[in-house]
Design a protein with these regions (language model features):
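N-terminal membrane-targeting/pre-transmembrane regions
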Residues: 1-31
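Pocket-edge structural micro-motifs
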Residues: 5-7, 117, 131
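Lipid-exposed faces of alpha-helical membrane segments in multi-pass integral membrane proteins
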Residues: 16-21, 40-47, 109
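Short, aromatic-rich membrane-interface segments at the entry and exit
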Residues: 32-41
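Short, solvent-exposed secondary-structure boundary motifs
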Residues: 40-41, 47-51, 94-96, 105
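Conserved beta-hairpin
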Residues: 43-82
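Non-transmembrane, membrane-adjacent beta-strand/coil modules in membrane-associated proteins
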Residues: 69-128
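C-terminal/domain-terminus segments
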Residues: 122-143
C-alpha cells in the first residue's frame, strides 16, 4: 500500500446533526414516555454512528490501481493530476464541473485533487476527489 487516506465527517457536523435529532428524541419522550424515549435515543445514537461510517471516503493507492470508495482504476490510465486548493476545488465542483466526471467529494473537505483519465473506452474525463493530502496522493499515483 503506497498511500491511504480516509476522509471522515468532522465532529462539529456530527454534533449539529445529533443535536437536531435529539430534539426528535425529546418530542418522542414527552409524548410517549420513558421507554419510547430511551428507544428513540438508542436509535438516534446508532444512526449517528452509521452516518459517521457511511459518509467516510477511503482513498488507496497500491502498486496496480487507485481506489476511491468502491471505484477503482488502473494506474496506467491516469493522466495529469492537479492539486486543488479551496478556491479551485469550489470552482471545479460547481461552475467548471463536467457532467461526465466522477466525483468523490465531501462538502466539508476544503482541498482535493483532479485526476485526468486517459482511457478511450471510458467516457469519464477526470476524477475529482476530496483529499487533505493532495500532493502526497499525486506523488503516490505518479510513482
Amino acid at each position: 500500500m503506497r498511500y491511504r487516506e480516509v476522509i471522515r465527517a468532522p465532529l462539529w457536523l456530527l454534533a449539529i446533526i445529533y443535536f437536531f435529532m435529539l430534539t426528535l428524541v425529546i418530542s418522542i419522550w414527552s409524548a410517549l414516555g420513558d421507554n419510547a424515549g430511551l428507544i428513540a435515543l438508542a436509535a438516534v445514537s446508532a444512526a449517528i454512528v452509521w452516518l459517521y461510517i457511511a459518509t467516510s471516503l477511503t482513498i488507496e493507492v497500491n502498486d496496480k490501481e487507485l481506489r476511491v470508495g468502491k471505484a477503482h482504476i488502473q494506474l496506467g490510465f491516469i493522466g495529469q493530476c492537479v492539486d486543488l486548493d479551496a478556491q479551485a476545488i469550489r470552482q471545479a465542483r460547481t461552475r467548471d464541473a463536467d457532467p461526465q466526471a466522477f466525483l468523490a467529494i465531501r462538502f466539508w473537505a476544503t482541498k482535493g485533487v483532479k485526476i485526468a483519465i486517459n482511457d478511450t473506452r471510458d467516457q469519464t474525463p477526470y476524477w475529482l476527489i476530496s483529499s487533505n493530502r493532495g500532493a502526497e496522493l499525486i506523488k503516490a499515483v505518479k510513482n
